[in-house]
């Protein structure tokens, strides 16, 4: 049965895309039905895909090739986050200095936490380079990690986990530290948890979503510039 399924899938160029979309749709449905943040569609979708590939004994390499079109949509999807930002352009202009300062500090904290973890765990340069761009969107982080000598595929997994944790804790952290300003919420979430966190920010409000989308772009640029400097701190 498994061999028949493998033969069927090998003859279909789009099965990886269909599997990915179906897994995410099922995860989104469960998230909507339960209303629990822990049932994140991205997390559930990833688990469903892993289970399917494991049960059917389908090599990940085959899935990766078939699902490649989904990867091509990462950059356009990230760019599309500029739409809510454009709708709040006046608010951005009024608070430009505070927003840029917040994103800059958040980026430095992210890089600093990676350095502290690397020193505490005595990570190698390769491991540190893999961990360093953990808080920026996959479209940027994997390229940065590869350029620095890290393991890009592992970076992608770390980025996803970072985003999911950020999305899960976003509202709790805001309540804990009495953060009520929507701009501050959006900047914090976008800088720390990239696109996955931004999906949560959009649920919290239009301003939060717009500021989070901006933070992804600015934090991505700052991280790409600063990572080559930071990686040299580990011998």
Predicted features along the sequence, with ranges:
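Transmembrane alpha-helical segments of multi-pass membrane transport proteins and ion-pumping complexes
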Residues: 16-29, 46, 50, 54, ...
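Residue-level detector of alpha-helical segments with a strong bias toward transmembrane helices
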Residues: 50, 67, 98, 147, ...
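Internal active-site segments that recognize and position negatively charged phosphoryl groups
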Residues: 88-160, 164
């Amino acid at each position: 049965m498994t061999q028949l399924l493998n033969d069927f899938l090998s003859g279909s160029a789009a099965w990886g895309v269909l599997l990915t979309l179906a897994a995410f749709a099922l995860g989104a449905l469960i998230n909507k039905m339960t209303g629990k943040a822990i049932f994140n569609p991205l997390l559930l979708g990833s688990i469903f895909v892993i289970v399917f590939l494991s049960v059917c004994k389908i090599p990940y390499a085959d899935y990766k090739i078939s699902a490649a079109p989904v990867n091509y949509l990462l950059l356009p999807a990230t760019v599309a986050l500029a739409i809510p930002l454009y709708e709040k352009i006046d608010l951005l202009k009024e608070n430009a200095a505070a927003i840029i300062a917040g994103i800059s500090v958040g980026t430095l904290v992210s890089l600093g936490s990676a350095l502290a973890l690397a020193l505490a765990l005595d990570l190698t340069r390769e491991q540190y380079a893999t961990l360093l761009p953990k808080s920026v969107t996959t479209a940027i982080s994997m390229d940065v990690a590869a350029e620095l000598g890290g393991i890009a595929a592992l970076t992608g997994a770390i980025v996803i986990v970072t985003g999911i944790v950020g999305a899960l804790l976003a509202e709790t952290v805001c309540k804990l530290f009495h953060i009520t300003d929507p701009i501050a919420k959006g900047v914090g979430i976008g800088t720390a948890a990239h696109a996955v966190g931004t999906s949560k920010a959009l649920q919290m409000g239009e301003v939060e979503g717009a500021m989070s989308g901006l933070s992804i772009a600015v934090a991505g640029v700052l991280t790409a510039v600063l990572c080559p400097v930071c990686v040299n701190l580990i011998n």
